[in-house]
Curated annotation (Swiss-Prot):
Location(s), subcellular: Cell inner membrane
Protein task: Catalyzes the synthesis of Und-PP-GlcNAc-ManNAcA-Fuc4NAc (Lipid III), the third lipid-linked intermediate involved in ECA synthesis.
The protein's name: TDP-N-acetylfucosamine:lipid II N-acetylfucosaminyltransferase
Record-stated family: Belongs to the glycosyltransferase 56 family.
Gene: wecF
GO CC terms, sorted: plasma membrane
GO BP annotation list: enterobacterial common antigen biosynthetic process; fucosylation
Lineage: Bacteria, Pseudomonadati, Pseudomonadota, Gammaproteobacteria, Enterobacterales
Length: 359
């Protein structure tokens, strides 16, 4: 029997760390198909912190892709589980036959499914990637992303799977300890990545609420982002008074980020695709409603779990936000499919499907 190999095809430290830690702590002990990884990027202490895993690191996305393709060609029974993706060479290999459909299992993280970049090289590449994605053996994704994908590729198998957000189920009831009143605090975006469209989001918040709310913008990740942070700060100060705008430019530890989220009353996310599910989960856990773009299909997952959804096109005010908070507080968080530990069983199923041990 050939052991399944997991591939982290792009150097995205935060997401890769979350996946590796999840596999090391939760899956590796019970499945031999949860231990082998090929990772784009440097070790950064992963080998030491994840002793249950066998990790190979590659200095570039291209080097990793070449190694994956070589393994795929050497043994056509070898199967790969691609997490996220973001690696052009791997899509082209699937397109050209270097990797066969029966070898390619893909967990969609959102960004690599959607066609939102306007650069020429992206516009030229998207049609090729779209064809390649139709050759995937099986995709794993959120309900909304599965629906989006199926419209383009109805013949490709799709299975429900959620990114393993780091969550403590014991915190499900903590939100009720806080009395929510007074000036609203609104979280804008889930990171400093430009995909959050921070400036457009700040303008949208201002249009809805004016300079009457506290606005918090976490931008400590990714690194080397100061020019964009300054751009966002300048745009924000043109709308909000200094005491109402908090731009966080330093990377935060998880517990500090969790504490920050729990001081908020509303999350505001205008990106037109599924992303930031970790932040959304932590906000929902704390009874903090989220404003989504109608083109972000994750609203389907929230509606399926009977969670209130606010949209950027809604007329928002404090009364609407407080009512959404009340509705969230009435939801039994222990039953939400995309919360820990409920997302665990689909991961066990996904491993068996990708390894060829389940129909």
């Amino acid at each position: 029997m050939t052991v399944l190999i997991h591939v982290l095809g792009s150097d995205i430290p935060h997401h890769n760390h979350t996946v590796l830690r999840f596999f090391n702590d939760t899956l590796a002990a019970t499945s031999e198909h949860a231990r082998e990884f090929m990772v784009a990027g440097e070790d950064n202490g992963f080998t030491e912190s994840c002793p249950a895993l066998s990790l190979r690191f590659y200095g570039s996305k291209k080097a990793l892709a070449q190694a994956v393709i070589a393994k795929a060609k050497a043994n056509r029974r070898q199967r790969f589980f691609f997490h996220g993706q973001f690696n052009t060479s791997l899509w082209l290999a699937l397109l050209s036959g270097g990797i066969k459909p029966a070898q390619f299992y893909w967990h969609i993280w959102g960004a690599d499914l959607y066609e939102v970049s306007h650069g020429l090289k992206f516009r030229l590449f998207y049609p090729l990637r779209r064809i390649a994605q139709g050759r995937v053996g099986c995709v794993f994704a959120t309900r909304g992303d599965l629906s989006y994908f199926a419209r383009q590729h109805p013949d490709v198998r799709g299975e429900l799977l959620y990114f393993p957000t780091r969550m403590d189920p014991s915190l499900n009831a903590m939100a009720k300890e806080r009395q929510r009143a007074g000036k609203l605090t609104i979280l804008v975006g889930n990171s400093g990545d430009r995909s959050n469209q921070h400036i457009a989001a700040l303008r949208a918040v201002y249009q809805q609420f004016g300079d009457t709310v506290n606005v918090v913008v976490p931008m400590g990740y990714p690194a080397n982002n100061q020019a964009y942070i300054d751009e966002v700060r300048q745009a924000g100060l043109a709308l909000f008074s200094d005491e109402n705008l908090q731009i966080l430019s330093e990377k935060m530890e998880f517990d500090a980020y969790l504490a920050l989220l729990r001081q908020c009353d509303l999350g505001y996310f205008i990106f037109a695709r599924q992303q930031g599910i970790g932040t959304l989960c932590l906000l929902i856990q704390a009874d903090i409603p989220c404003v989504l773009n109608r083109d972000n299909p994750f609203w389907q997952d929230m509606a399926e779990q009977h969670l209130p959804v606010l949209f950027t096109t809604d007329d928002l005010n404090e009364q609407v936000v407080r009512e959404a908070q009340r509705q969230l507080a009435s939801v039994d968080k222990s039953g939400i499919t995309f919360f820990s530990p409920n997302y665990l069983q689909p991961w066990h199923n996904a491993l068996r499907i990708a390894a060829g041990e389940a129909e």
